[in-house]
Design a protein with these regions (language model features):
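Short hydrophobic/aromatic beta-strand micro-patches
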Residues: 129-135
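Coiled-coil-like amphipathic alpha-helices with heptad-repeat character
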Residues: 2-5, 46
């Protein structure tokens, strides 16, 4: 009862705090962002797919302008603060710990953590995305074979829109009794320099092993 009451109070307070912030935002764009945020947090969808699914759920036309990723990420943080502030920090820490284990395991391939687990918006429904920067594009795949690790192969959209190879592993979480998806995206070593350039908001879009260790040393927020 107390937890539900606290969530309700947070919702009321945040609604008031955000009213002015979003006053000039078109209502449909705001609804798309909020619906997409819910789909990301509760169903583990990636941003692009979540926005398209939100369009369908809201009955909007295919040509409706979509909110940018930054706006959806803001809505994700709002959704987490309203509905899962009690559980999300622990789930995020568990995912970052699992990511670090695999970064250390794949250390020869310059692993970098990206996506929601790096940004701090992941929940137990989120996948882990590691980007590997390899001298030989087949070397990471060979390493998995040598370790007896089962994986699925796919081609996905890369950092600059180019097709890249992705190796997907289903990791079992004893804590949650379910699988967590781990995606290893294979890049050329020369792609690493541009991949570390900060975004327009000044934040690093991904981090290496030392950066993830540092995150795990920080107290939960």
């Amino acid at each position: 009862m107390g937890g539900a009451k606290n969530r309700l109070l947070r919702a009321v307070c945040m609604a008031g705090d955000n009213a002015g912030m979003h006053a000039a935002e078109p209502s449909l764009s705001l609804e798309i962002a909020r619906t997409a945020a819910r789909l990301v947090v509760e169903d583990g969808l990636e941003l692009g797919r979540a926005k398209r699914r939100a369009l369908q759920q809201l009955g909007a036309s295919v040509g409706t302008p979509l909110p940018d990723n930054k706006r959806v990420e803001e809505a994700i943080r709002e959704h987490i603060a309203l509905f899962c502030a009690d559980t999300q920090p622990g789930e995020l820490r568990a995912l970052r710990t699992l990511a670090l284990e695999w970064m250390e395991r794949m250390q020869d391939f310059r692993p970098h953590l990206g996506g929601a687990v790096w940004q701090g918006t992941a929940t137990r429904h989120s996948d882990i995305c590691l980007q590997l920067f390899c001298d030989d594009p087949k070397s990471a795949e060979i390493a998995l074979i040598d370790q007896g690790v089962s994986y699925r192969f796919a081609t996905v959209r890369g950092l600059h829109g180019q097709p890249v190879e992705a190796l997907t592993i289903a990791l079992h979480s004893a804590e949650w009794g379910e699988c967590v998806g781990l995606h290893l995206l294979i890049y050329d070593h020369d792609d690493l320099r541009g991949a570390l350039r900060a975004g327009s908001d000044g934040r690093a879009p991904r981090g290496g092993t030392q950066a993830v260790r540092k995150l795990l040393l920080e107290p939960p927020t």
